């Protein structure tokens, strides 16, 4: 399985049918203890602060290009990857990742509708084994239209 075309908002049942596609990367932005207890099979964990700049007094801006490229590469994102993001807090963290990807020039992404709670409540499979991502090479190519 290699070709994957998912909508911007993906339903849990659609995502479950898509597990196993070569270019799919599921990114969990839940709290670390939640990830250790349960996550979608194959999902890599990303700590939310890694996609935020930490320069005082401007906390929360985008990290610099080199940092952003390193972080996204380290979790397995390249230009061919379709990212599905979710969290356990209403989608804010996952949505921030998708906006960050858009700003960085990567438009292949989806948000899991309802996040981890919808996935679990609908009885889809869960895992507690950590996933080690395959490192890829991500290059930031600014999409100036995406800046707020």
Predicted regions mapped to residue ranges:
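Positively charged, proline/Ser/Thr-rich regional signature most characteristic
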Residues: 2-80
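Thiolate-centered catalytic microenvironments shared by cysteine-dependent enzyme domains
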Residues: 3-4, 60-148
């Amino acid at each position: 399985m290699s070709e994957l075309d998912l909508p911007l908002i993906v339903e849990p049942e659609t995502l479950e049918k898509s597990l196993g596609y070569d270019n799919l990367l599921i990114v969990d932005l839940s709290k670390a203890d939640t990830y250790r207890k349960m996550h979608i099979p194959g999902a890599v964990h990303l700590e939310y602060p890694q996609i935020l700049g930490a320069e005082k007094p401007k906390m929360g801006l985008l990290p610099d290009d080199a940092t952003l490229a390193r972080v996204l590469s380290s979790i397995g994102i390249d230009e061919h990857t379709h990212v599905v993001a979710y969290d356990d807090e209403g989608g804010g963290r996952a949505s921030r990742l998708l906006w960050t990807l858009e700003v960085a020039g990567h438009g292949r992404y989806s948000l899991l509708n309802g996040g981890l709670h919808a996935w679990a409540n609908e009885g889809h499979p869960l895992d507690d084994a950590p996933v080690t991502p395959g490192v890829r090479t991500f290059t930031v190519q600014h999409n100036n239209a995406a800046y707020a």
